[in-house]
């Protein structure tokens, strides 16, 4: 199970990008930039910005785990589904969730 705070996510993603249409928006390369200001620039709610960052964070972790050899058998898949709380949805549904991130 993954436990992290919004602060953990912001710290991890402070030099990452927000993708909207075909443009990339810098989330934060300047320490003084507040995420609420970024949300205003993107015309988004603050929570939507954080939610998207969290989904991207989970997606990267999930993909890393999928390609980890220790998770390549049936038992490994079950462990991953439990870790990400995805036991009750199909692989196709998981893919759709992450594509919308």
Model-based region annotation:
Residues 1-101:
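Intrinsically disordered, low-complexity regulatory regions
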